[in-house]
Amino acid sequence: MPFTPLHFGPHALVGLSFEKRLDLPVFLGANIAVDLEPLMVMSLGLPYPLHGIFHTFPVGGLAGLVFATLCFPFRGHLNRLMKYLRLPYATSYTKMAVSGILGAWLHILFDSVMYYDITPFYPFQANPLLGLLS
């Protein structure tokens, strides 16, 4: 489900645990960006799977990379935000890119365990992660 609060807590925990290696705002933002796809499907009533191509590791990773690239020019604003939150922040394009990809992938991993309509290893149609934790 788009923007589920169940994603934010675990992703924030991972992001904060690796704050020196990850760009926290990009990591968390990429995790949310992946759910723009189901939001559009529901909002516009599109005849498309709720969890479609963006919920695959290849395309989701690419979406995370694009998100990081779009955030790169705004790193000064992100720096001010992190200072306001009293969180350390030092970034680079590489750090942002890796954070975007990993943020998207973690989101897909979480959803793959719960939702039957996800094919995380596209083009393979199976989801071996479905029900893994049940």
Residue ranges and their predicted role:
Residues 1-134:
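N-terminal membrane-targeting hydrophobic helices
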